[in-house]
Each structure stands twice: as C-alpha cells, then as structure tokens.
From Swiss-Prot:
Molecular function in Gene Ontology: ATP binding; glutaminase activity; phosphoribosylformylglycinamidine synthase activity
Listed name of the protein: Phosphoribosylformylglycinamidine synthase subunit PurQ
Function: Part of the phosphoribosylformylglycinamidine synthase complex involved in the purines biosynthetic pathway. Catalyzes the ATP-dependent conversion of formylglycinamide ribonucleotide (FGAR) and glutamine to yield formylglycinamidine ribonucleotide (FGAM) and glutamate. The FGAM synthase complex is composed of three subunits. PurQ produces an ammonia molecule by converting glutamine to glutamate. PurL transfers the ammonia molecule to FGAR to form FGAM in an ATP-dependent manner.
Pathway assignment: Purine metabolism; IMP biosynthesis via de novo pathway; 5-amino-1-(5-phospho-D-ribosyl)imidazole from N(2)-formyl-N(1)-(5-phospho-D-ribosyl)glycinamide: step 1/2
NCBIfam families, per the entry: FGAM_synth_I, PRK03619.1
Gene3D superfamilies with a match to the protein in the record: 3.40.50.880
Amino acid sequence: MSAITVGVVVFPGSNCDHDTAYALASFAGVKPVMLWHNNHDLQGAQAIVLPGGFSYGDYLRAGAIARFSPLMKEVVEFARKGYPVLGICNGFQVLLESGLLEGALSRNRDKKFLCCQTTITPVNCSTRFTEDYHQGEVLRIPIAHGEGNYFAPPEVLESLQEHNQIAFQYCNAQGEVTVEANPNGSLLNIAGIVNRAGNVLGLMPHPERASDAALGSVDGRLLFESLFRSLTGV
C-alpha cells in the first residue's frame, strides 16, 4: 500500500508545523509534506492540516491575513471537493476566516493567553476525524491560544446543533459540560466544529501535543488514526 500523503501548510508565523508533521510521521505509512503558503501545489496530498501558530503575526485578527495566501485558494477548493481538511488552533481560525466553517473566534474571556491542559469530550463521533472516539469519554488535550472564544449568532448555533456539527466540547474530569470547565468563554463550551459534510474540522486544542506518551497524553492520537483509517478504508 502506498504512503498516505498529508500536507501541512506553513504560513509565516506558524510554529506548530513541525510538531504536527512529527505526530503525523509517527504513523506507519503516512508521509507529511510541508506546503509553503505562497505556492499553489498541494503535492498530491490526500489530506491537509492547517497547524497552530501566529500566521502573519495575527495582525488585524487571527487568521485574517492567512486566508488570502495563494495556497488557501487550493485548500478551499480541495475541501469543497470533499477531501479532509483539519485546522488546529490558528488553523481553526484560518478555516473560519476562509468561510469553510461558520462562526468566529474572539479574545479569551479573561483577555489572557491560555497555555494549559484541558479536558474535552467528543460530541459527534461519526466524522472521518472522530470515528475512533466514543461519546462521553474524557480526553486530555492541551490548549495554547489568546483568541479561542468561539462565537456565532443564535441561528448558526442552532444549525450546528441541529446538524450535529459540534465535534468537541470542553468538559470537566467527569465528562460534564459545565461553565467552570470552559477555559475561554466559548459559546456552548465549543472546542471544535465540523462542516455539514463532515470533511472539515477545526478545533482549538492541540491533538499533536497529545499524541506521544512522553508528552503526558495520547488522547489526540485517535483523531489522526480516525482520519487515516478513513483514507485507507482499513
């Protein structure tokens, strides 16, 4: 079986691109390729990851400039054809700015940058990113962001719920979705959402930082396993 090629987009200011590539390369049969933002060539990628960082220094607002990168035209078309696209932290912000996902991410509730371990629970376990998870389980996955406060108008929130597009919610250690467990003020404790087709996922927690036992958690690893299983049919 030929290797699965996964493109990792590199913007000026990305700082989790190599972490993400390292996590991807830890899976047998997976070949990460770095995709510079100023190109148009996806290098035969079967999936795309927009990693965390501070693309273009987060000027204007997080992800606002990155959406205009030449490569993003290809990523948007790639996603609209039904191929999988994952946005992590700043990558989630870019997906929102690009219109591939609905809503917006604003400054954290307390206006402080947060870098800490969080617990989240899977809500929709039927997407190609989440099939290896189980509803109600508690995942330990860290966050590191200043603008992770998810906001959307009431009609968008209703639509997300109606179409099962909330992928992950912040929860406590018992798996309860509570105000106290919400680190940044996100509406409905939203930690990640998918598009209606289920092929585009954006989340603020960093699964690549929870994919190796040496990092204290492997709970993020199943997200990548789910994706690769969907690509290989195994």
